[in-house]
């Protein structure tokens, strides 16, 4: 099943199951905070670095170019509030699609002892179609015994060969 995505939104949809990546590095002190006491399900639960959130969350990022064209300053994608993201993508539908995709992939990978910490998706403007790749470059995948199977190998100082080795290992694990 395939279709051409016309006018793809400049939005990356991120599903976060663990307090890692952007959330860990940008939100000072969040890694030692607690869920509000009046929360109906998770009152007082501690948020810890590298640990699971009470449940996966979906957020929307504006995709910046890697370099600012005039100043050549390195840019990062920026987190958007739902109301702003909804100008470009059907947030309600995209949230459902992202959560369903994450759930299906999590169930599949759990059979291989792999946990998804987070996943970045490209979803159509109507919020109903995931397009583009789902790869080790757009998520954080951890094996119970083998550790990181994604781009964090490189971020931790690993060589290109080590990254390819982990990615090939992930490929073998999910195709056999």
Where are these regions (language model features)?
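Acidic/polar, glycine-anchored loop/turn motif associated with catalytic or activation segments
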Residues: 1-118, 125-176
């Amino acid at each position: 099943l395939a279709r051409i995505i016309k006018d793809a939104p400049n939005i990356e949809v991120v599903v976060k199951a663990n307090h890692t990546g952007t959330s860990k590095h940008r939100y000072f002190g969040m890694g030692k905070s607690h869920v509000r006491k009046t929360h109906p399900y998770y009152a007082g639960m501690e948020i810890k670095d590298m640990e699971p959130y009470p449940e996966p969350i979906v957020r929307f990022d504006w995709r910046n170019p890697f370099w600012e064209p005039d100043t050549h300053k390195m840019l990062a994608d920026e987190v958007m509030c739902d109301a702003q993201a909804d100008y470009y993508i059907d947030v309600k539908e995209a949230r459902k699609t992202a959560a369903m995709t994450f759930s299906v992939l999590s169930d599949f990978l759990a059979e291989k002892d792999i946990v998804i910490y987070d996943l970045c998706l490209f979803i159509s403007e109507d919020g109903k179609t995931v397009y583009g790749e789902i790869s080790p470059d757009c998520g954080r995948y951890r094996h119970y015994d083998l550790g990181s199977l994604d781009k964090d190998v490189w971020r931790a100082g690993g060589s290109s060969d080590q990254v390819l080795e982990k990615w090939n290992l992930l490929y073998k694990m999910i195709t056999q």
